[in-house]
């Protein structure tokens, strides 16, 4: 995704281009619009805007933008990331209702799955709890080199709150599964 906007300064407009709308709004820029797939934007030194679209380019959005990478207060292609995550929770709730599972508590894997988990718990009429604490000083584990480094980092990154998990049927909600190794370790920690 790519979005551009403008703001007035003392001598005219200045422009900003970013992958998320929140980058523009937090700096006081007005969003003009999202760029289309295959579109090129050029702003010359006279601040004239030129665009060109390469024909026959289909849009192929990356799901990781919606579930993991984008901030919830962003908008991508005119759709609120937060609202999209709420809808994901609603969709998941419908599927889980059909399974007749006994769930005592819904716990998000921090942070991006939180809004989906809250909606899911509400729609299932089940308690929502913060059962895992995230160490904010550990980076993104799925991009770390080597499985042993990732495993070690996951253990340092998340710590369970036993009070919220002990002797309960816990439904963990994560934003995505890349390799599945993170999920296995988190489940082991929660048990």
What is each PLM-predicted segment?
Residues 153-191:
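PRPP/pyrophosphate-binding module of the type I phosphoribosyltransferase fold
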